[in-house]
């Protein structure tokens, strides 16, 4: 169990590092966010199953619902930005541009 949780934590850290390094393109940022949500889902599921805490079995499902909503909103924003500007740069989302 310890090696699995270390691997999941490393996957979360790698996705966070990717989010910090590749923040210029929106698609790569969305993929890193999905990787973070997936590792959080797996880790929370493993913790709940190992502790046998039956009252919170719905927490990973709730996390998946929020991840799906985040992905849908992110993809809609990606389509809108790429249709308006032709690129998926995050700097196109700045409202202070002239």
Curated annotation (Swiss-Prot):
GO-annotated biological processes: ATP synthesis coupled electron transport
A single MF term (Gene Ontology): NADH dehydrogenase (ubiquinone) activity
Top-rank EC class of the record's enzyme: translocase
Gene3D superfamilies: 1.10.287.3510
Localisation per UniProt entry: Mitochondrion inner membrane
One Pfam family matching this protein: Oxidored_q2
Family per record: Belongs to the complex I subunit 4L family.
The protein's name in its UniProt record: NADH-ubiquinone oxidoreductase chain 4L
Protein's organism: Microcebus ravelobensis
Gene: MT-ND4L
